[in-house]
Amino acid sequence: MVRVAIDAMGGDFGPAPIVEGTLLALNEKDFIPFLVGNKEIIEPLIPQKYKKTLEIIDCKDFIKMEEGASSAIRRKDSSIYVATELAKEGKVDALVSAGHSGATMSLATLRIGRIEGASRPAICAIMPRQDGKQSLILDAGANVDCKPEHLYEFALMGYEYSKNVMGYENPRIGLLSNGEEESKGNELTKSAFSRLKTLKGFVGNVEGHNIFDGSTEVIVCDGFVGNIVLKTSEGVAESITTLIKNFVKVSLTGVVGALFMKNVFKKLKKRMDYAEYGGAPLLGVNGNVIICHGKSNAKAIKNAIFQALTSVDQKINENIIKAFASHPSKE
């Protein structure tokens, strides 16, 4: 049975939604959860019937969001450090954390290490599409400065994740740029283009709107651009929701119309809700690591655990290693 370490302490709202999400996941799938954190706080949140189906790994410290990621390597009693060590030592098959993302990335890279062929890990963000499916964008924040070889590796990792975990038979890869023509872009994207066009599934340069229109499954960029795209998308989604609510309240007609559109709004909200997608896999490390939003609710944690289980079941790292072996980068 798959074993999953869950950092119970690092989220914005404390351990309650993390524990709840773990229990929701247990109700639907079989796995062994290791909740890592302060046992005195975690244990009262667990109903008696679940206490024999999970294990609490007691540690008193945790990395706060406002602290620097560099402090994590010295804080060996912190929840994310202890959870990472479980993964490093092979005591768990996957790690899920809604804590300090910088600390999670640093520890996963330094303590678990990188898989053979990966020079940089990448955060793989899942984005909603107009056709009801999802696309991937990577890197979404792990590497602000990249070389063309890194984008080539990101494309390989994204292709394998999209194919093996998300179920796309023939994923299409696009290079995020400021125009579709090969001549568009900066020095990085132009150099990367010549490498990427040798890959199966590469469709060329894509623009921001292609992330959502269903024309591409894997969108490749450096972490600086990717993180801006991710945060901008979140902001636009929140703004649209707020604007709709404000316009509805302006008149009685708006209120009545909203009642008739209630089911449509529910479906729209679900499609745009980050909790539906769980978290972002950190690809390129020698383990299955899922990084969740700090404000993750129980549903998001549940779905992040499901992501981790699928990654393990589909042997995503083994598939990425094979891809690197047959398509070596030339850094």
Swiss-Prot record:
Disulfide bonds: none
UniProt similarity note: Belongs to the PlsX family.
GO biological process: fatty acid biosynthetic process; phospholipid biosynthetic process
Transmembrane segments: none
A Pfam family hit: FA_synthesis
Record EC number: 2.3.1.274
Protein name: Phosphate acyltransferase
GO cellular component, one term: cytoplasm
Protein encoded by which gene: plsX
Pathway membership: Lipid metabolism; phospholipid metabolism
Free-text function comment from the UniProt entry: Catalyzes the reversible formation of acyl-phosphate (acyl-PO(4)) from acyl-[acyl-carrier-protein] (acyl-ACP). This enzyme utilizes acyl-ACP as fatty acyl donor, but not acyl-CoA.
